[in-house]
Design a protein with these regions (language model features):
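A short helix->loop->beta-strand "cap" motif at the edges of active sites that frequently abuts
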Residues: 49-52, 157, 199-200, 217-218
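A basic- and aromatic-enriched beta-loop-alpha substructure that forms the phosphate/nucleotide-
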Residues: 52-127
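Binuclear metal-dependent phosphoesterase catalytic core
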Residues: 91-94, 174, 181-200, 208-244
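Active-site-proximal loop/helix segment associated with metal-binding centers of metalloenzymes
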Residues: 99-161, 166-177
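Active-site neighborhood of phospho(di)ester-bond hydrolases with catalytic His/Asp-centered motifs
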Residues: 23-28, 54-59, 84-88, 161-164, ...
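N-terminal active-site segment of His-dependent metallophosphoesterases
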Residues: 1-55, 61-70, 127
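Active-site environment of divalent metal-dependent phosphoester hydrolases
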Residues: 1-7, 31-35, 60-67, 90-92, ...
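Short amphipathic alpha-helices and their capping/turn segments at secondary-structure boundaries
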Residues: 11-15, 43-47, 82-95, 99, ...
Length: 244
């Protein structure tokens, strides 16, 4: 969330610990089409300190009225020569496929009116020139999920990592959100798929809470800074890493 000055001030004062060659970011870095995104000094720092940086796009990437319908599968934005933001993309590094997707979630019809009223996505994101609706939100989820499943199924890599913005199981729902009708805009239940997927790691964001869980043989991980001005950064790890 580099669109907020408090977050950048915090990261400048407490930079990431470089504990690996590749930096993976699960979305909500800033607004696409905004100079503050493309010219942000964080990208220069990340480019200099990591061999490669790969991000999936979060919902906030589209908050300057970006038209999601214009994004094809495999869309790749080169932020710096070794820094990339993906919409339904695959990065092959050595014997590992990194599959990156926003994912979105699935909003049941009975929750659609409430969700459209309380979630900013439906006031800030376009789809085919109009404000996105819950039906289009759900359609993007189906597109993303199909992409992920196909990418995993056809992968010949020894290891597979999935990076999504939205949360892939209610196993990672923080107790403070239990019972909220808005949960359907943040999380989708994919436990049955994940259990037998053969995915090594699934990295997620969006929830501003960090809960790791093992589903089958897949380790689900998160390390979100959240909003510093809301004091959501207390359990953020500056050097969290995984080894393949």
């Amino acid at each position: 969330h580099l669109e907020f000055a408090d977050n950048w001030r915090y990261l400048k004062a407490h930079p990431l610990e470089v504990t690996g060659d590749i930096l993976l970011l699960a979305g909500d870095i800033g607004y696409l089409g905004d100079d503050n995104y493309s010219k942000h000094p964080f990208w220069d720092w990340a480019s200099e300190n990591y061999k490669e940086v790969h991000c999936c796009m979060g919902n906030h990437e589209f908050y300057k009225y970006y038209d999601v319908a214009t994004l094809p599968d495999g869309y790749l934005l080169e932020v710096r020569p070794n820094v990339f933001s993906h919409y339904n993309g695959i990065a092959r590094i050595g014997d590992t496929d990194i599959i990156l997707s926003t994912l979105w979630s699935r909003i049941p019809l009975e929750d659609a009116y409430f969700t459209e009223q309380v979630i900013s996505d439906f006031r800030r994101i376009l789809y085919k020139g109009e404000l996105m609706t819950h039906a289009q939100f759900n359609a993007e989820h189906e597109r993303c999920l199909t992409f992920i499943k196909d990418a995993v199924a056809y992968s010949q890599a020894a290891h597979k990592i999935v990076v999504t913005h939205h949360v892939p199981s209610f196993r990672m729902l923080h107790p403070k959100f239990q019972g909220s009708k808005a949960n359907v805009a943040f999380t989708v239940e994919l436990e049955d798929y994940i259990t037998d997927s053969g995915i090594d790691y699934w990295i997620y964001g969006h929830s501003h809470t960090n809960i790791d869980a093992r589903i089958g043989n897949t380790q689900c991980l998160s390390n979100q800074l959240g909003y510093v001005f809301s004091n959501e950064h207390q359990d953020f790890s500056h050097g969290k890493y995984l080894t393949i």
